[in-house]
Structure formats: C-alpha cells, structure tokens
C-alpha cells in the first residue's frame, strides 16, 4: 500500500477539513482527520462500515459539533455552526436513506430546499429555480404534484439531491447515494454526480460503499479506517493500489 496518507489536496481547495475530532458520547469516531476538496472536484470518501465516513459528513454539515479541528469553506472556519448556518454558508448535505417527506408532494418537498434563501428573493426567482430543478431532473417533472410516497427509490434519490441543490450550495455532501438502487439507476445517479461537478461547478464530497464505482468518477479519494485517514491520493492512484483495495475497499 503505497498511497500517500496525507490529505488529497489541490492548489485551491474549496473545502478543507483540518485535524477534525468528533464522536458520540465517550466514543471518538473521527481522530484528527484532514481532507481537502478542490473547486468543482469530486472527492470520494471510502472505507468499511464504522470507518467514520458518515460522521465526517455530519461534522462538516453541522449535524454534530466537532470536538476539535476546523472546517474551512473558501478559507473561512465554519466548525461548530449549526446545519441551517452551514446551508446558508454554502454547504448542503444529503444524508443516506432517501429522506423525503412522503406526505408532501414532489414540489412541496423541493420548496423546502429554498427555505434558506434570503427573504428578499422574489416569487419569480423561486419559480425559476423550481423550473430549473424539474428541467434538470426530468423524471420528477411528470410527478410534480404526486405525493413523494409514490416515488421509486431512484426517484426519491433524485428528489433529495434536487432539494439540496435548491439551496444553491457550493459544496454538496452525498452520503451513500447509490444505496439500495438497481444497477441501472445507480449508474444514472453516478452520472448525475459527475454532471453536477463538471457542468455546474459544484464541489462534491461523495461517501460510498461502492468504492469501485466511486473511484471511477472521482478526482480524488480518501480512505478512512477506524476514524483515521489511512490513504489519500488522486482516484486513479487509489484504484491502482491492489493491496490498499484488498485491505480496505473490498475489491
């Protein structure tokens, strides 16, 4: 395993996590974790169950408060802010589990994504943003007034990503977006992730159990084990490291 164990870095990282320590009660789930993600790049965060991947996203998004360390967005330290403040700063989080509100329609679910907008934004701005969301996620347009409970797993995943994008983030945190999806739908979701990065300039932190698929689309990768970074490099280097793959990634 020859991969560099320092953080995957770029010349101008949009998001940098420095020496982050976080946990639950007396359990330390992240131990001095440092990573960075370049503007409009995809950074895959990989590792076995319990490695600390989801905790990392929760700490970055404000769902849990780090015990130590910094979360820098364009150089500004946001560590310790709550989720609403993180969204307003430009970080949106899509947790695993396709967490739609089933009793609301597709459009009503999407409107929740605009709750962080300043009060001065006009109704026309909101309508235009919704139209853009339905154009970008065409399968949702035909179900605009259907209850979210009626959507398939793939459509629900599209909905939660579309809702997060309506907050107009610079950084998008995706936790297991392919979980439970059929291979064809999973490929569509991965293609969407690439387009968000390449065409819309969004910096993406992608947590995935499907390490092979994540490295295939990522620019950089970080491997966690027991709350620590054990490898970080460009995605091609990690994918080519046979010992690393077998030991930590399962392929």
Predicted regions and their residues:
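The feature captures the beta-strand-to-loop junction immediately N-terminal to the Walker
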Residues: 46-48
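ABC-type ATPase nucleotide-binding domains, specifically the catalytic core motifs of the NBD
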Residues: 25, 43, 81, 106-128, ...
């Amino acid at each position: 395993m020859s991969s560099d164990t320092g953080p995957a870095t770029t010349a101008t990282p949009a998001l940098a996590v420095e020496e982050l320590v976080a946990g639950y009660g007396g359990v330390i789930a992240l131990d001095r974790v440092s990573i960075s993600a370049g503007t409009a790049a995809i950074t895959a965060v990989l590792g076995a169950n319990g490695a600390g991947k989801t905790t990392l996203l929760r700490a970055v998004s404000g769902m849990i408060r780090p015990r130590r360390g910094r979360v820098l967005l364009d150089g500004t330290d946001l560590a310790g802010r709550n989720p609403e403040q993180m969204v307003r700063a430009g970080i949106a989080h899509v947790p695993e589990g396709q967490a739609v509100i089933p009793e609301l329609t597709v459009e009503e679910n999407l409107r929740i994504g605009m709750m962080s907008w300043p009060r001065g934004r006009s109704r026309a701005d909101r309508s235009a943003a919704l139209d853009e969301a339905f154009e970008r996620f065409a399968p949702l347009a035909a179900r605009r007034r259907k209850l979210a409970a009626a959507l398939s797993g793939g459509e629900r995943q599209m909905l939660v990503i579309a809702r997060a994008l309506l907050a107009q983030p610079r950084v998008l945190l995706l936790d297991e977006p392919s979980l439970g999806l059929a291979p064809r739908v999973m490929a569509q979701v991965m293609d969407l992730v690439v387009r968000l990065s390449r065409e819309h300039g969004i910096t993406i932190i992608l947590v995935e159990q499907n390490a092979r698929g994540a490295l295939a689309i990522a620019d950089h990768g970080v491997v966690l084990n027991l709350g620590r970074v054990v490898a970080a490099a460009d995605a091609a280097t990690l994918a080519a490291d046979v010992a690393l793959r077998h030991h930590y990634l399962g392929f």
